[in-house]
Amino acid sequence: MSRTSAGFADFFPTAPSVLQQKRVRAPRDRPCPKDRPEDQLHVQDDNGQSSCSPGTSAANVSTNGSPPSVSVSETGTGVENSGCKLVGETNTDITGTDTSILSASLAQCRATQVNEARFDNLTPVTNAESSPPRKLSPHQSKSVEVAEYESNKFATDESKLAATPLHTPPTPRSQTSRSGVIKGCKLVYDPDLEKRSSKEKRRKPQYVDFVVNEQDGCSPDPRLSILNYTRGAGCKQKTKYRPAPYRLKQWPYDTATTIGPGPPVQIVVTGFDPLTPVAPINALFSSFGEISEINNRTDPITGRFLGVCSVKYKDSTSFRGAGPVPAATAARRAYVECKKEQRIGTRRIRVELDRDGAVSDRIVARAIESQRMGHKKNIVGEEAKVEPQAKKNEPPPTAPKGPSRSSTRPVAAVPEGPRASFLKPAIPSLIEETPILAQIKRDPYIFIAHCYVPVLSTTIPHLKKRLKLFDWKDIRCDKTGYYIIFENSRRGEEETERCFKVCHMKPLFTYIMNMESQPYGNPNYERSPSPERLQAERRERAERERLKKEADLDLEEEKKQRAIDLDPCREVLALIVRDLKDKLLEDVKSRIAAPTLYDYLDPDRHAARRRALGIPDPEGIRRHTFRLDADNFGSNNPRSFLPGDRSFSPYGLNILALPRIRKARRLNRANAAFLDERRKQPVRRKEVRPLYHRLQQLHDVDDSDEDQRTPFSRDIDEQDSRPPSRMSSRSSISDDGEESEPLDGLAPQGKRHESRLLGLEYEDSGNTLNEAVDGYSRHDSPGLSSTRKRKRVAEGIDVRKRPKEESERSQLNRSVEAGDTFYEESQHSEAAELGTVKPENLAGIGGKFLGRVEDRSINEDGEKENMERLHIESAIQGANLGIQQPLPDESTTTKSHEDPITEIEWGVSNDEPRPTVVDDETIILDLDGWQNLVKDEEDLCFLRHVLDGQSRSKVGNLSAWAWRQKEIKALNRAGESGPVHQETRIPDYYVCNPTGAARTEGRKRILESEKSKYLPHRIKVQKAREEREANAKSDPHASSAAEAARISAAKTISKSTSRSTRVNNRRLVADINAQKQALPMQGGDGDVLRFNQLKKRKKPVRFARSAIHNWGLYAEENISANDMIIEYVGEKVRQQVADMRERQYLKSGIGSSYLFRIDENTVIDATKRGGIARFINHSCTPNCTAKIIKVDGSKRIVIYALRDIGRDEELTYDYKFEREWDSDDRIPCLCGSTGCKGFLN
C-alpha cells in the first residue's frame, strides 16, 4: 500500500485549528498502564464480534486468546465508510503488544480511504509489488493521529458524495457495526474561573468526552422524505409572502402629463367654537399659503354658525418674500401641521383635506341634523318644565289673551359647540320586508315560525353557528319567521332531511325550534307557462294595446275635429232651442193636455156608460172648479211639500180627484213647474214639544201655541204616513174634567186651526165639504171607494176614542134628532159655500174632525177668515152630534181584511196594539237625532238603562254644550238644523279604495283640479272668493269702497314699515363698518361682508298650508315694495343633471318642482337640499319677483317684493314657464286670482 499524503496539519502546524486539535488529542494520547490486560483493549459486542477501543478505532481480535490478526488491504480500496475492519487477501499477523503500530496502520488505512478512494473497484486486489507494513516512527505516529482526526472530520461529508454502483453486494451487519465515537469534549473544570490568588498553584482544566454510538444516533436524511426529491422537485424556488403591497414613491403631479383631478387645494376645519370669528382662523391658515376663499358654514334656515370652516388656497408666485408656493403644497402643509394638536382658542381643531367640497358638505349635513335633534329635545324638556308653572299661574277667564304662538317668532337657541362624534349610521336590518316564501322556487328549505323563535336580526348569527354542522346555503328571515335554505340538488334535499331530524324541537336559547321541512321547495310554486302560452298572451296583449291605441287616436281625432267645428253661436243657439222645447212642452202639458184630460174624465160625460155597466155615480169626489195641483201647491197645508207626502206617488193618485188650476199661496207661479217635491220647505212647528224642551224648560206653559211650536217627530213623519197618536189627536172635549160644552158655541181659542186638517180653502167659494173629505182620504188605496174610506176613517177614530168617558157616547146618541134639524138648517144656509152633502157622507166625518183638530198649523190671513173657519167648525160639530153613524156593511169589512197593509199604514189599530210612532232607522244619531228618538219618559228610562255601564263624560254646562254642538252642526251644514239623514261631511272627501286599503293601491297621481274639490282649505278659499265676487256684482259701490279702504290702510302700514326699515338699515351699516375695522384688511373681505349683509337683510317669513298648492310662504311682518325678502337656496347642478333628477323625482312620487334655473347651464335644485324659499307658490298676479344677483363671483337668486305686502299674506311670484302649444300635459293654475291665465305653461 502506498504512503499517505501529507495533511493540513503537516503543512500548517501552527494553524489555530491544528493547535486546537492537538489540545483535544492530548488526553487521548496518554499511554495505557502496563498492568492492563490485552483483552481489555477489545470489547465484545452482542454478536460475538470484537469492536475496537476508542484508542484503536478498529481491530480484528480473536476471542480464544490467540494473538490478534489484522487483515490490511494493500490498495486500500475495500474499506467501508461505516466499518473499521481492514479486509484483504494478504493478511499479516501483528502482535497485540504494540498498540501504536495498530493505530498507525489504522490511521494509514483511513488516510488512504480519504485521499485514495476508488469507485470502480469493490473487491480488494492483491498486488505483489506492494510493500509490507513497516514500523512507524514516533514522529510519524503523531502525524498519523492528526490525519486520523482529519479523516474522521471529513469522512461523513465525503461519504455523501460517493456513488454506489448498482451491483454492490449488501454489507453484512457485522461489518457495519461500530462502537461509540467521540464527537467532542466538555469542559467540566476551568481554572481561569477560580477566584484564587495568582500565587497558588493552578490546576489543569478537566474535559469529558462525548461518546455517541453511530448505529443508534445516526438519523435518516430528512430530504429523502420529500416527494420526488431526487428528481429535483424539492428544489423549486418558493415565492416570498408579502402581507402588504410595497409603498412606492408617489409621482409628483404634473399638469402636462397627468389626467384627472389634481391634488386637493381645499381643507375643512372642525372642532373650534362656533362663535369664533373668522379672523383667528384666517390668521392661522394664512401662514401656510395664500388663501383664495374662506367660508364659515352656517345653517341655511336659522343662519347660526355650525363650527365648520372651509379654507381654499391658491397658487402664489411669491409668498412672504420666499419662493412660489403652489396651492396643493399649502393645503398639504396645513393638513400635516394641524395634525400636531393645533388649537384655535382653547379647543383642539381637526383638519381634513377636501378635494371637491364633498367632505365639508357631509360634515355640515351631520352638524345640522344633530342640532335639529338637540333643539327638539330641548323644546320638549322646556315644555315639560314650564307646564306645571303655567297651571299654577293661570290668568282669570276674563283677562285679555296674549298674541298667538303663530304670530310670535320662536327664540333661537344659543348655538352650541360641534359634537365630538356624529351619529353613527344605523345597522341595516336583516329582516326582509318582501315575503321570502314567494322568492323560494325549488330550493329545499326549513321554516321556523316567528311564534316559536321571535324574529330578530341578532338571532341570525347565533342560528348560523347553531347549524354549522349542516351544509346550508343561506339563512334569511322576514316577519313570518326564519328560512334555512339549502342547495337545489339531491344532496341539498338530504341535508334538509338530516337537519330536520337532528334539530327539530331542539332548544335555541330559551326557545324551541319547531321546524317545518320542505325538501322539494315551495309547495305553492307554479312553473312558468310554456313558450306557446307566453306567445299567445303576448299576441293578445299586443292586439289589445293596438286596439286601445287606435281608440285613443280616434278619440283624439274626434276631439280635434270637434274643436275645429266648434262655433259659440251654434252652441248658444242649441241651448236656446233646447230650453224653448222644454218650455213649449211644459206649456202644452199645462194649457192643452191637462184641460183636455179633465174634460174627458168629467163624470157627467160618462154617466150613460156608467148606467149601462151598472156603476153608481161618484158622489163627493167631483170638484166644481178647474185647478192644477191645488192639494199640493195651492193648499195652505205646508206639509204638502215634504218628502213624506205621497200626493205625487201612484198609490195616492185618484183619477177622479185630479188637481185643478187655481192661484197658489206663498209660491211663485212662474217656478211651479220647476219645483222638486223633495225640497225642504220652511214649516211651522207643532204645538207638541219634545221631552228635551220639557226638561230644560225653555218655554213656559202659557206661551201661545202659534208662537212656540216644536216638532214632535221628524218632518216627514206626518200623521198621513203613520197611525194617529193620542197625544196629537185630542178631542174637542177638554181633558180637564169638563164633559160638555155648548153645542152652538164658539170653539176654544187654542183650536182655531182645526179645519186645516181638511185642507179647506175658504177664499175660494167653490170649495165644498166633499173636497175637504177627499183631501183627507186621498191617500187611501185607489181600489177602495171614497164612501168606504170615509167610513173606515170614522170607524178608526171612534175606536181610538173608546177609552174616553162613556158619557161622550151617551151625549152623542141623545143628540141625534137635534143634529138632524141642525143639519137641515146649516145645509140651506151654507149651500153657496159648502154645497150639497148627504147625511151618510157626514156620518163618518165628525169623529175625524174632532180627533185631528190639533194636528195641523195654519197661517192667519185675517180676522174675517178666522170667523169663517170658526163658523164652519161649529156647523161640523153640530152635524157630528146630530147624525147617527151607520154601521159598516160586510163588503167594507171584507175589503179591510183583504188589504191589511193599507189599514196598518193609514188606519187606526182596532184589533191589536200598534206602535204609536214608527222610528226612522236612517236618522243620524247626533244630538238632534237622539232628541227626536226619545219621545217620552219610557224611552228616556230605557236609554238610561242601556247607558248604566258607560262612564260619564265631562261636558260642563249641559245647555251650553248642546247649544254649541247644534251651532257647529248648523255651521257645517249651511244653516240646516234638526234631524238629518246624512252625516255631516264634505261630499266626495272620503273616497273608498277599490282594493279596500290604501296600501294595496298602486301609485297614482291625483290631479290638482281634483284636489281643489275636497281639500278643506281650498274649499274655504273658493267659497270666500265666490262670496266676494257675488258681493261685488250685487253692490259694486261697497266693494270699491272696501278696496279704497284697504289701499289707504296699506299705504299707512307701508309708510311706517319703510321708516322702521330705514332705521334697521342704518343699524346694519353701522354693524358692517364695525366688522370692517375689526377684521384684518385682505382681498376677500369685501365679498364676505357683502354676503353677510345679504344674509341679514332677509325678512322673517314662515311656511304653512296654502290654498293654492300644498305649502306656501307667508310674511310674518309688513314688507315694503322693493325690499329683499329671502334667498332661494339649493344645490347648484348642471342642466343635464337637473333633467335627470326631475325624471327621478317624478318616478319616486315627488310631484312638486323645486328646480330654479339661473342661466342656460346652471339650475338650483332645492328639492332635498334647500331653504324654505322653495315653498313660494305661483300666481298670475304675483306680489314678489325673483332677481339673479352676483355675490362673491357666484350667481344667487333673491326674492324681492313687487308691492307692499301685509302681514300673514302669502308670497307668490310668476314661475314664467314657457308656453306650450298643442300640448296635452299642461299644468293647471290654481292661484284663483282675477288675472289667472288658467295654465302655468
Swiss-Prot record:
This chain's source organism reads Aspergillus fumigatus (strain ATCC MYA-4609 / CBS 101355 / FGSC A1100 / Af293) (Neosartorya fumigata)
Instruction: Locate the compositionally biased regions of type Low complexity.
Output: 724-734, 1038-1064
Function text? Catalytic component of the COMPASS (Set1C) complex that specifically mono-, di- and trimethylates histone H3 to form H3K4me1/2/3. Binds RNAs which might negatively affect its histone methyltransferase activity. COMPASS recognizes ubiquitinated H2B on one face of the nucleosome which stimulates the methylation of H3 on the opposing face.
Catalytic activities: L-lysyl(4)-[histone H3] + 3 S-adenosyl-L-methionine = N(6),N(6),N(6)-trimethyl-L-lysyl(4)-[histone H3] + 3 S-adenosyl-L-homocysteine + 3 H(+); N(6)-methyl-L-lysyl(4)-[histone H3] + S-adenosyl-L-methionine = N(6),N(6)-dimethyl-L-lysyl(4)-[histone H3] + S-adenosyl-L-homocysteine + H(+); N(6),N(6)-dimethyl-L-lysyl(4)-[histone H3] + S-adenosyl-L-methionine = N(6),N(6),N(6)-trimethyl-L-lysyl(4)-[histone H3] + S-adenosyl-L-homocysteine + H(+)
UniProt protein name: Histone-lysine N-methyltransferase, H3 lysine-4 specific
Record keyword S-adenosyl-L-methionine present: yes
Q: Which UniProt keywords apply?
A: Chromatin regulator, Chromosome, Methyltransferase, Nucleus, S-adenosyl-L-methionine, Transferase
Molecular function terms from GO = histone H3K4 methyltransferase activity; histone H3K4 trimethyltransferase activity; RNA binding
Compartments where found: Nucleus; Chromosome
